Amino acid sequence: MLLNTLLIAIALLSAAILLAKRVRDNAMWRATVTPLASIIGSGFLVVVPLLGHSVGGYAPVAMAAVVTLAYFIGSAIRFNILYMEPVLAAPHSSTTAIGRVNTISEIALGIAYFISVTFYLRLLSSFVLRGFQIDSDIVAQSITSVILLGIGIAGWFRGLAFLERLEEYSVSIKLAIIASLLFGWLMHDLSNLQSIHIAATLPSDLDWWYVVRLMAGVLIVVQGFETSRYLGDQYDGATRVTTMRRAQLLSGAIYIAFIIVTVPSLVLLGDDVSETAIIDLSRVVSVVLPPMLVIAAAMSQLSAAVADTVATGGLVTQVSGSRFQLPAKAGYLLVSLVGVILVWTTDIFEIIALASRAFALYYALQCLGATMVAWQQQKDARNPWHVAGFALLSALLFVAVVIAIPAD
């Protein structure tokens, strides 16, 4: 009873701090929220059962490896913010090799965003309906369409500021619940130290090739940091670089901590690797955690969808260039309209695999572009480690495009 009360109090206190006006109005925090919302998105709750089934007690090591690789990929995006963007701002840059690579990568990203925003909100609709014991594709598609149009229309009339506020509230609620979750699970582990036996062993039926492909898919789960690249109309390069780095470090710490505290409970998992698996498992910690995690899951879908919508606005502005000069709000409306079409004409749960590969292709091309920019720098400014590192990342990501198993 005491733990239940304490967990609710921690969640409420954390939410109060994050939603305080001083925090909400902080420009650095607002710029951090967009990548943070996208990184801790739909795959957050499914990572634990996925890694638990595939690598057993080595799940924290696997998660740390994925987060570290994602951070290095983020360094390529940050490099591009500082050094590629000035190159792309030059006249006729779109006809250069760097310009073409960047354009192709952004087309891939646009496709991924259109699908992922629709996927997040369709998942949100299903999650809400499941709570009311309603299983209807028509109702879920209708709710998804209403939310999509609501976000698009609000973005068109109210602009980026409104969408950022929506992000802030949903991310703050999600982070508050995560803080409560981590504390509760840690207390559960500490109170059961005598009976905890964590074996750093791998499953007996381990398939290494499957694990490698799955890790490539998990890498896409922690994507979203690239959204900072497309906030250029609102924030300067230095701000976007700093806040992207903070978002990656904070989200990485959360992912790793989440895996560590849940590892002792992995033996209780069945064969279910869906989001509901970890929600059901949280009952061993506290009766208040399952409903809190349902709210956190819903906020994850909403905040990730809004974050990708915001990034799509900046992406549309960049891709349209000086010839068409489409404003960011056109991107908000476009992604909502395309989403409505997708939700009624496709099985969004089937084509999400295409989005995962498109994200991997985007990162591969961005790393390739970073390699080209680093190579073209003056000899006295050229860093051979940048050239070699970005080239290696690009090669690894091109392989991931082909072999990755989507983890969402």
Regions found by a protein language model. Name each.
Residues A90-P91, L121-I143, D233-G237, T242-G252, ...:
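Helix-loop-helix connectors at the membrane interface of multi-pass transporters/channels
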Residues A89-I98, Q248-L302, Q318-R323, S336-V340, ...:
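TM-loop-TM module centered on a large, flexible mid-protein loop between adjacent transmembrane helices
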Residues M1-K21, V46, V61, L181-G184, ...:
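A generic transmembrane alpha-helix motif of multi-pass inner-membrane proteins
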Residues L2-R30, L50-S105, S126, A247-G252, ...:
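Extracellular loop-to-transmembrane helix junctions
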Residues L109-L123, Q234, V288-R323, I352-A355:
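Membrane-helix boundary/coupling elements in multi-pass transport proteins
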Residues V128, Q141-H188, I352-C367, W385-L392:
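Membrane-interface loop-to-helix entry segments
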Residues A20-R22, D137-V139, I143-S145, A161, ...:
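Helix-loop-helix junctions that connect adjacent transmembrane segments
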Residues R30-A31, V55-A62, S75-I115, R130-Q141, ...:
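Transmembrane-helix boundary/entry motifs in multi-pass membrane transporters
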